[in-house]
Curated annotation (Swiss-Prot):
It is found in: Secreted. InterPro entries: Turandot. Its main location: secreted. GO terms for cellular component: extracellular space. A humoral factor that may play a role in stress tolerance. It comes from Drosophila sechellia. Keywords: Immunity, Innate immunity, Secreted, Signal. Belongs to the Turandot family. Coiled coil: none annotated. It holds the Pfam family Turandot. This is Protein Turandot Z. The keyword Secreted applies. Residues 1-23 form the signal peptide. GO terms for biological process: cellular response to heat; cellular response to oxidative stress; cellular response to UV; innate immune response; response to bacterium; response to heat; response to oxidative stress; response to UV.
């Protein structure tokens, strides 16, 4: 009997500690998402935008598929994330299958042959597409995190 009481006490303490850790993690992720969203809106650098997007995707990966998920919206976001990753994946400094960095790299290599407005348009495309992705994931996760 004494053992059962001690065991239940230990389990209760562990349960409380785990619950608080989960709440702290949720708060930390929520705060980080807010910071990343602000940085995404303020940044004018394509590389920074891509870095922010990958960090937001990492947070999204932690929470997707959990209870209270909107299956249709997650399917749309998963499609956007996979498309983004496919276009921006870099392996050993080399873009996989060209992608966005292939376009930007080709533009940078042929900088003298490509008009400045075309280079600027390509960079603006990268920045705007990453901002849209970050905003979509941010809106979805913030709505989902409010439920907890």
């Amino acid at each position: 009997m004494y053992f059962a009481i001690r065991l239940s006490f230990v389990l209760a303490v562990l349960f409380c500690l785990t619950g608080n850790g989960s709440a702290r993690m949720l708060d930390a992720d929520r705060n980080r998402l807010q910071q990343l969203q602000i940085r995404s809106q303020q940044s004018t650098d394509a590389n920074t935008q891509v870095d922010i997007a990958y960090e937001v995707i990492g947070i999204y990966d932690k929470y997707k598929g959990q209870g209270g998920s909107n299956v249709l919206r997650e399917a749309q976001l998963n499609s956007q994330v996979n498309d983004f990753k496919r276009k921006t994946m870099v392996i050993d400094g080399v873009p996989a299958q060209g992608g966005v960095w292939g376009i930007l790299g080709a533009i940078k290599k042929a900088a003298d042959a490509v008009p400045d407005n075309v280079k600027k348009d390509a960079e603006n495309l990268v920045k705007s597409s990453t901002k849209v992705l970050v905003r979509g994931i941010y809106d979805y996760l913030m709505g989902k995190m409010k439920q907890h």
